[in-house]
Amino acid sequence: MIWNDHSDLRGCHAFLSPSQSRWLRYDMEKLEQVYLNMQAKERGTKIHELASQLIEFGIGLPKNHKTLNMFVNDAIGYGMESERVLYYSANCFGTADAISYSEKFKRVRIHDLKSGLIPAKMDQLAVYAALFCLEYNKKPKDLEIIMRIYQFDDILEERPESDYIDEIIDQIVISDKTLNKIGGR
């Protein structure tokens, strides 16, 4: 047999992939919905990459009330790092869209850019705050923690109580120990 050459597709996955065959049970409306969601996710990834590069190079955007512009301009204005990995263990780590820490003011600022249609929750940012405390040996009660979500051309801001971050820290530590006992990383 002389096989057709598709070497350029190695490592790629088709939307109608045999290994992800649940699409066989979709009606055309569901197929369309899942496909559009996948495209939105890919668009969100590209927007995050663009935002990260703009922040890294200090290139601001026009000042207006557009989500991307506010996120990029605020991150640059607050001297934030883009796409910073926060690590506790192989079982628990994540990448903050933008983060900064001021030793002088004992302030950690965590910003998250959301491009999806589902309203975001602050839980993700609170976990980043907990990871920051664990990795850099900081106590939440000694910090001012500012968390912001940029979505729908708006900014949501919370300043969590230290007890809440302590609870997340405890949950991370306990969950990590449990996973390690049962053969996690």
Predicted regions and their residues:
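Short, well-ordered amphipathic alpha-helices
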Residues: A126-C133
